[in-house]
Amino acid sequence: VYPHSDIDALFDAAQQAMPGWAQASVRERIGVLMQVVDVLYREHLFELAHAVMHTAGQSFNMAYAGSGVNALDRAIEALVYAEQAQNAVTPSARWERQFGASQIMLDKTYRLVPRGVAVCFACASFPTWNAWPSMMASLATGNPVIVKPHPATILPMAISVRVFRQVIAAAGFDPNLVTMALDTMQDPIGKVLVQHPKTAIVDFTGSVAFGQWVERNAYPALAFTETAGCNTVVLESTDDLEAALRSLATTMCMFSAQMC
């Protein structure tokens, strides 16, 4: 049985953890998060693969790849993009302009300001696939994260959150930069999290219906959604019907029919 936290307390803790993290340099934040990647890979990868197997129902190979090494690839990619975006902002600039006989000169300084608390929804089928890069992107840019796993796949995200918190604390920062909000299918809290007044970012992966609700109701929070996809196939002609049918069957059934 997992503990259930008070939602307002989670947001308060996240906000209190943010100032020290925001004051750290981009390089320092990225370094801490790369350490998270290293610990997940070296110490927890097989544990996480089995956790996904026994919650999402995937084969070991699929869990190891889709919710393991490939998800870590995506986490690192998010860190790269976050570093590039932040380093593209110059720390200072001098502006000069002539107004008649007067020369106006301004020395400008710029600083990166986090948006605020991010809420990350992890999906039921591939819990870490989008959650890890989402968490990394928010944290790398100075934002604390509240993780909301799907009730069916809490274990892999609980392991992940524990690792994030341990590494962040070991680096001297407040571990409440990463927390977890749990619910059940009978008593969901997703809408409460999305519409909480302290929510600044919503990153949702899951059903089309709730994803559309998030897109309509997340404002003024910044919202990102990835929902299920289903593509139609028009078979115009083929010179090998058996091979074509085999390919279509593989497409429909691959990844235990869980991949979007």
Language model feature labels by segment:
Residues 145-148, 203, 224-225, 234:
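Short hydrophobic alpha-helical runs that function as membrane-insertion/retention elements
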Residues 163-172, 209-260:
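ALDH superfamily catalytic-core signature
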